[in-house]
Amino acid sequence: MYSFVSEETGTLIVNSVLLFLAFVVFLLVTLAILTALRLCAYCCNIVNVSLVKPSFYVYSRVKNLNSSRVPDLLV
């Protein structure tokens, strides 16, 4: 059977294609990890805004109200 390219050239082409595919897979995996981290940060921000900040506001508000009432109780 006749070959259009030599064995060395064919091996070089195949290795180049496989290296390119490995690079593309690496980029996709990296992109997926970065997207997951961004989603995690977004969800943490939602938890912070919806749970932590209101809880801290209520805590500090009650603490201020209680600290202003303490002298009245001592009198």
UniProtKB/Swiss-Prot annotation:
The keyword Transmembrane applies. One of its GO terms (biological process) is viral budding from Golgi membrane. Belongs to the betacoronaviruses E protein family. The chain crosses the membrane at residues 14-34. It comes from Severe acute respiratory syndrome coronavirus 2 (2019-nCoV). This is Envelope small membrane protein. Keywords: Apoptosis, Host Golgi apparatus, Host membrane, Membrane, Transmembrane, Transmembrane helix. The gene is E. It is a single-pass type III membrane protein. One of its GO terms (cellular component) is membrane. Plays a central role in virus morphogenesis and assembly. Acts as a viroporin and self-assembles in host membranes forming pentameric protein-lipid pores that allow ion transport. Also plays a role in the induction of apoptosis. Regulates the localization of S protein at cis-Golgi, the place of virus budding. May act by slowing down the cell secretory pathway. May interfere with tight-junction stability by interacting with host MPP5. This would result in disruption of epithelial barriers, thereby amplifying inflammatory processes. Residues 35-75 are intravirion. It is found in: Host Golgi apparatus membrane. InterPro entries: E_protein_bCoV, E_protein_CoV, E_SARS-CoV-2.
